[in-house]
């Protein structure tokens, strides 16, 4: 191979490595803070404090359940935290929450449910699995198994807490 060709290939290789490095660093930086709306972020703090639930946990659930999209729907569950009006009709009435597509109402209903689960079960991974409708939640907990769902949320919660200086 000619010397000029080797130099060109070396430069091209270094450019690719540099580009990939910047892309990876940029991707990591992008995941450091939450991408939920400013209003949802504020509601997580307001409602989290009201229910004594870590606001970062609420943010992590929102990211996992809906990627921060208040109009998300899946199998009868709607909104940021994927709440089912069918299962939480009484809770919604009690809380005065009328629209699960409304960020505040959705977070309020979900936080109320999570608070109930935390009072009953205490263990975050178990609470998250039950919240997610995992029929094996109790068995997983008793066997010391943390689901990917719960693990992802707990990891993201810890990351957000670090970013927020906790």
Model-derived features: positions:
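Non-catalytic cell-wall polysaccharide-engagement segments
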Residues: 2-43, 47-51, 69, 86-166
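Conserved alpha-helical segments that form or flank metal/cofactor-binding pockets of metalloenzymes
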Residues: 62-77
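Glycine-rich, phosphate-binding/catalytic loops in enzymes
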Residues: 77-80, 147-149
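Extracytoplasmic
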Residues: 53-56, 75-78, 122
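Structural recognition of the beta-strand scaffold that forms the well-ordered cores
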Residues: 60, 80-82, 127-130
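Solvent-exposed, flexible loop/coil residues
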Residues: 74-76, 84-87
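Short amphipathic alpha-helical segments
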Residues: 41-42, 55-59
């Amino acid at each position: 191979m000619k010397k000029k060709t080797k130099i060109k290939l070396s430069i091209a290789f270094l450019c690719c490595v540099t580009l990939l490095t910047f892309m990876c660093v940029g991707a990591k930086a992008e995941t450091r803070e939450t991408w939920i709306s400013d209003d949802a972020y504020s509601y997580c703090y307001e409602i989290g404090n009201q229910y004594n639930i870590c606001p970062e946990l609420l943010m992590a659930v929102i990211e996992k359940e809906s990627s921060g999209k208040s109009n998300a729907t899946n199998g009868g569950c709607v909104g940021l935290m994927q709440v089912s009006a069918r299962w939480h009709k009484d809770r919604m009435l009690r809380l005065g929450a009328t629209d699960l597509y409304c960020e505040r109402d959705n977070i309020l209903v979900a936080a109320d449910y999570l608070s109930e689960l935390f009072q009953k079960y205490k263990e975050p991974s178990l609470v998250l699995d039950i919240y997610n409708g995992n029929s094996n939640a109790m068995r997983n907990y008793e066997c010391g198994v943390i689901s990917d769902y719960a693990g992802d949320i707990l990891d993201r919660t810890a990351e957000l807490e670090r970013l927020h200086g906790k």
